[in-house]
């Protein structure tokens, strides 16, 4: 049975409001044809039991053949044109053979069960497509764009361009990934980040398409086109993953061709040899048709893809995008995980951690006001952290003049008539003079740097007046994720970072990582990955920066955090954690392992049924109806078993396994 791919046509709709709906069963042509075939078969069986004329039974059963068998028959003929022997065609031939020897009811039963298993397969594909449609339906169809003169116009969200200003009213869905320019509100972004409570948003904060604005109005600047938004990337990656095949499936399909040819040869032998020993042609043909049916690898072919596709769809709904069935399959074989530091275990965005004032004329807010004003024209990340801290305290920044940037050292500007310099301790000690810097200030700088903080000195009119400690905040879930990863894989994770040893060791202690490798360049990270894998580890590497891309490519599986601003990193990674929640990494590994267990169970069920029925048919006499029912029944069992991973409880169960 051919595994159907997710059709892009099934993932589009004219109305965004319809996109989140689940596909109804009878919206699928496979379901309609299977139901019609079942109805005709039931009617034919009823007429047979009631003693109706033979032509009535035959008419109903032949109609069952046509409705349930035309799609697999056509698919089989098309495969034959490509010189491929398809199981679909073999099943139709077997059903026709059954009719040829007067066993039309049994052949119709085969058609019905085969059509039903095909409908179940289509249902798996449709449910995956539903997840894609649901994601695409999160973003609104229109947006209120604000013109240069302040006028408002309603436009299609797809027509928004980078830099456009959009007004988001209370209760509206946000139409694009953007930055807040004015206003304040709380935003429900559970659909993208998974956070259960609304998140406060103010000037400078990032918002995502498809999230819901709260009680305040926001004016936002578009950062990404609609096709590049977070939800669009999720949908694209889930769709692409659904069109791939796992290594197990590729192996099965490779073997299937040779198996099918051998099966046809044995079928011919089963038909041709017994008459030489006196068996009737009709009995030999019946045995041969029964053999062809029960030896068909339908259940084997269906064993692999439904569980993996269901796992991909479920993980996608929870913010983890596996780019292919191969990736979903490989995740479960992970024996060790390596994490980058900045942007992975930490948020990747510098934040102000503390203020130390060394002149009584300044308060904390006044010192921050001067430093933020001086840094406002700067494009340095540390300067942005200082400005954001001032904005979060709602400090109004004064006008700045005579701004000068000295890259890597400091910035200077005239603020309120004072010359303010903000920069590194090393650079500004030379400017201000070590004699002017109090001993307590020197001690504080040394201590904070030893603790892993970046220290910024604020100088007013050539006199140092305060210190600002800036840090890259540890993700709150990092320690829990490391603990879960250790329990799940049986090996403690590794920290691979380009940061200095002191900072890396401090973070390792915080999250529970003993194997810390610091000061690594991109090539060094690749070498570390290869060394770990040479020791037998199947390594999953988690990173976010462009410097992590080579290591992600070299790993058994590479996972990028959704905050990664590098397109190269996102393209190189095998999977993406869109919601930036580290705890989903152990969960998706547990989900992959469960999918692999279901695949193995399916293969055991399929092979056991086929082997048992083949032996029964060749060694004894297997009634055709019983052979059809048991063979196709095993196919349906395998298909339904794979569908279990589509349920929301499957993700919760995987999370429970990973974090117990």
From Swiss-Prot:
Its EC number is 7.2.2.-. PROSITE patterns: ATPASE_E1_E2. It is found in: Cell membrane. It comes from the Bacteria. The active site is at 340 (4-aspartylphosphate intermediate). It catalyses: ATP + H2O = ADP + phosphate + H(+). InterPro entries: ATPase_P-typ_cyto_dom_N, ATPase_P-typ_P_site, ATPase_P-typ_TM_dom_sf, ATPase_P-typ_transduc_dom_A_sf, Cation_Transport_ATPase, HAD-like_sf, HAD_sf, P-typ_ATPase_IB. The keyword Metal-binding applies. It is a multi-pass membrane protein. Induction: Transcription is repressed by NmtR. Induced by nickel and, to some extent, cobalt. The chain crosses the membrane at residues 33-53, 60-80, 94-114, 261-281, 292-312, 598-618. Keywords: ATP-binding, Cell membrane, Magnesium, Membrane, Metal-binding, Nucleotide-binding, Phosphoprotein, Translocase, Transmembrane, Transmembrane helix. The keyword Transmembrane applies. Coiled coil: none annotated. Belongs to the cation transport ATPase (P-type) (TC 3.A.3) family. Type IB subfamily. PANTHER family: CADMIUM_ZINC-TRANSPORTING ATPASE HMA1, CHLOROPLASTIC-RELATED (PTHR43079:SF1), PROBABLE CADMIUM/ZINC-TRANSPORTING ATPASE HMA1 (PTHR43079). This is Probable cation-transporting P-type ATPase J.
